[in-house]
Amino acid sequence: MMIHNIPYKIYGGQNFYQRKEIKDILAYLKTIDNGLDGQAVKRIINVPKRGIGNTTIDRLQEYADFNDITFWEALVNAKDIDTIKNAALSKLEPFVDLIGRLRAKEEFMSLKELAEAVIEDTGYIESLSQNETVEEVEARRENLDEFINKVVSYEEGCKEAGEEPTLSGLLEEVALIGDIDNLDYS
């Protein structure tokens, strides 16, 4: 309906981009893209669970605020923060390394491959299996597959327009679609 500009409203359903698994993968992609969105970084710092506590997150934010830097920059420099204990550092560093590896992959992967790498490298599906029923995990997997299809559509649309698909461009398009989905046509 959106493709043909037909106004519609979902009753009793949930906007695709408001689903937990879609918000999670988008937060990973935003963090890979530039790390400027502190909320995105905070959303995924414990997805899947890494044992990073709220106190550590608060201390990172305080350091970021005091030094006028982003939350991500504070996270990268966590070893320089006196109030962050070694035990917390040992949990933060693998997360920073993971994002670094995914950023390196962005250089030579398609966006589809990058999105799949996020799901695979983070162990996202496996982590869902620990807390949800088989049916819930399968529904989330199907939503992630649909997201991958949307990424492929974005890449194909760019190629048809003679443009290079970029992660920033994908995220901008998703933001626009999310805004359109939230419009009230009544």
Question: Where on the chain are the PLM-derived regions?
Answer:
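Conserved helicase C-terminal RecA-like lobe
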Residues: M2-P7, R19, L26-S186
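Conserved helicase motor
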Residues: Y11-R19
